């Protein structure tokens, strides 16, 4: 394709709000253009890359007998009300109503709709298992869209849904999808690591995320250097081994602590280590207030709280609620209280005596507080985030941290949707059973961004061969010179039969062409310049920067060999 005919609006300067390198490069290289916050148009080069990604996805889906369909983005509210998610999903769900006052959502996922499609069709165990997938735009009203395609309000996704008669069948499809996702990310050129994760608003009993390692990633991965253990930090278990500090129990004392708000400020004020301070936070669990205690250097993990209490209906109490309940602001809370409120403490709190806690009075704290004498703990548990260097639950050694971008996730949904939506089949005994489900998503547009995030240098994008928008970049330095133009035209005609060629035939300065070529990042470059009359051209590899002069008689062989050896 001739570059003069392709819409590639490269930029010299990018908006300052483009923080992620992938966002900057996708804008700068003319692959995407922002329409409004979190919404982008995919221009010709990006569209070609997306087509290459989706081709790989389709191949791997078909390999495991997943069948493609296409569902509407617009979903009626009644389906979401059946599952209970219409009220539970929150403000991220884009809601609208038609001229008749009927409520709809622009789908972020399609569990409800796909369940409604199959519930009256998959009637017998003989029709199972069945896996359906689609590639489609999704919508989520992000509070703060950022990082370009990594967190947008409209995005392209491959979502698949499987239906089963028993757990063994679900396990097999889950494993098939897990392996298919691993192959997909390897093929598109992403270093992605599967990690144990939380299922969030989608629900389900078991899930893995596929995380593309990147410094810009918004998720923290906990992993082992000695085993294949990897988990999202929200799910990483903290191993508790008792380490009691045997100090003499001291009398309870109330002290004034003016202008002290945080655990670190309190530790500094008292001249004590922050891990001897105990923080108290108040949550509402299904409408009931509880206190949760952790040591001063630890942070409460609300995902673990949801898992522990078996409900998503958990939220941090507001400042007004806290003041009304205990008469003090959040920085002064403590478990020594004359109100009926259940107290839960992280396992590591029980290692301490003579605790320092809030006095439930602004500007005051209690020291030498002891469990059993001054207050009681209803239950201990793992309620906090793991720290780097702590022991991992698989016994392999210390926890290490890395940042990652979630590019895919697989879920075992069980009967969460089929039960609420009455999707049943007859088993081999003729009894009605709820369909057992799995769901599996890949962020296609996010994968595009993750590829760029992991495959670039200071000059621009470096496309992996499998997804590159074109294989070769043919550049005529000066098309006004007959020998250069004629040779470039001839090479374009020859190589276009075997490769996808982008032919830069523009009337631009050489520097502009080379800068654009580096930005766009095609794997191989053929430059027709001042030695065209001798039949000599330059061949350059984008990844290594290696270049050599080649006679046109040898050019096809050289290019074919180099291309075959590309990754």
UniProtKB/Swiss-Prot annotation:
Its EC number is 6.1.1.15. GO terms for molecular function: aminoacyl-tRNA deacylase activity; ATP binding; catalytic activity, acting on a protein; proline-tRNA ligase activity; transferase activity. Keywords: Aminoacyl-tRNA synthetase, ATP-binding, Cytoplasm, Ligase, Nucleotide-binding, Protein biosynthesis. It comes from the Bacteria. GO terms for cellular component: cytosol. It catalyses: tRNA(Pro) + L-proline + ATP = L-prolyl-tRNA(Pro) + AMP + diphosphate. Transmembrane segments: none annotated. Homodimer. HAMAP family: Pro_tRNA_synth_type1 (MF_01569). Catalyzes the attachment of proline to tRNA(Pro) in a two-step reaction: proline is first activated by ATP to form Pro-AMP and then transferred to the acceptor end of tRNA(Pro). As ProRS can inadvertently accommodate and process non-cognate amino acids such as alanine and cysteine, to avoid such errors it has two additional distinct editing activities against alanine. One activity is designated as 'pretransfer' editing and involves the tRNA(Pro)-independent hydrolysis of activated Ala-AMP. Consists of three domains: the N-terminal catalytic domain, the editing domain and the C-terminal anticodon-binding domain. This is Proline--tRNA ligase.
């Amino acid at each position: 394709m001739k570059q003069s005919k392709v819409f590639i609006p490269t930029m010299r300067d990018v908006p300052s709000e483009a923080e992620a390198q992938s966002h900057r490069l996708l804008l700068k290289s003319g692959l995407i253009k922002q329409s409004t916050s979190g919404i982008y148009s995919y221009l010709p080069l990006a569209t070609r890359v997306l087509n290459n990604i989706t081709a790989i996805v389709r191949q791997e889906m078909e390999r495991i007998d997943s069948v493609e369909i296409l569902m509407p983005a617009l979903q009626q509210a009644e389906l979401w009300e059946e599952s209970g998610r219409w009220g539970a999903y929150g403000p991220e769900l884009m809601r609208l109503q038609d001229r008749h006052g009927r409520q709809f959502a622009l789908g972020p996922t399609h569990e409800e709709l796909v369940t409604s499609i199959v519930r009256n069709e998959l009637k017998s165990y003989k029709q199972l298992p069945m896996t359906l997938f689609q590639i489609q735009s999704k919508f989520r009203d992000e509070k703060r869209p950022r990082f370009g395609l990594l967190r947008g309000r409209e995005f392209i996704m491959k979502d698949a849904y499987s239906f089963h008669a028993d757990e063994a069948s679900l396990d097999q499809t889950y494993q098939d999808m897990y392996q298919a996702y691993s192959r997909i990310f390897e093929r598109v050129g992403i270093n992605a690591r599967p990690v144990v994760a939380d299922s969030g608003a989608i629900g389900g009993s078991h899930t893995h995320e596929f995380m593309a390692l990147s410094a810009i990633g918004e998720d923290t991965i906990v992993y082992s250097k000695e085993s294949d253990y990897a988990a999202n930090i929200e799910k990483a278990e903290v191993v508790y081994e008792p380490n009691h500090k045997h100090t003499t129990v001291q009398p309870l004392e109330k002290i004034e602590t003016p202008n002290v708000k945080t655990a670190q400020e309190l530790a500094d004020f008292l001249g004590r280590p922050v891990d001897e301070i105990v923080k108290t936070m108040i949550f509402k669990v299904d409408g009931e207030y509880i206190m949760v205690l952790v040591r001063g250097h630890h942070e409460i993990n609300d995902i673990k709280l949801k898992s522990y209490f078996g409900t998503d209906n958990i939220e941090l109490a507001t400042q007004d609620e806290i003041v009304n309940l205990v008469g003090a602001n959040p920085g002064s809370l403590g478990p020594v209280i004359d109100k009926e409120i259940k107290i839960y403490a992280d396992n590591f709190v029980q290692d301490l005596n003579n605790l320092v806690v809030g006095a439930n009075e602004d500007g005051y704290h209690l020291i030498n507080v002891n469990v059993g004498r001054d207050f009681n703990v209803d239950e201990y548990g793992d309620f906090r985030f793991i720290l780097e260097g702590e022991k991992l639950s698989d016994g392999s050694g210390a926890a290490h941290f890395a940042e990652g971008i979630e590019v895919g996730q697989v879920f075992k949904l069980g009967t969460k949707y089929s039960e609420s939506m009455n999707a049943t089949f007859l088993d081999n005994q003729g009894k009605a059973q709820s369909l057992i489900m799995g769901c599996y998503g890949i962020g296609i547009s996010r994968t595009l961004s993750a590829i760029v995030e992991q495959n670039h240098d200071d000059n621009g994008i470096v496309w992996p061969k499998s997804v590159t928008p074109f294989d070769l970049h043919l550049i005529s330095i000066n098309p006004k010179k007959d020998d250069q133009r004629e040779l470039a035209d001839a090479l374009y005609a020859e190589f276009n039969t075997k490769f996808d060629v982008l032919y830069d035939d523009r009337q631009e300065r050489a520097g502009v062409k080379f800068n654009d070529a580096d930005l766009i990042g095609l794997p191989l470059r053929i430059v027709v310049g001042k030695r065209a009359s001798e039949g000599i051209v330059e061949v350059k590899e984008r990844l290594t920067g290696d270049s050599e002069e080649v006679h046109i008689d040898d050019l096809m062989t050289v290019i074919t060999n180099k291309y075959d050896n590309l990754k």
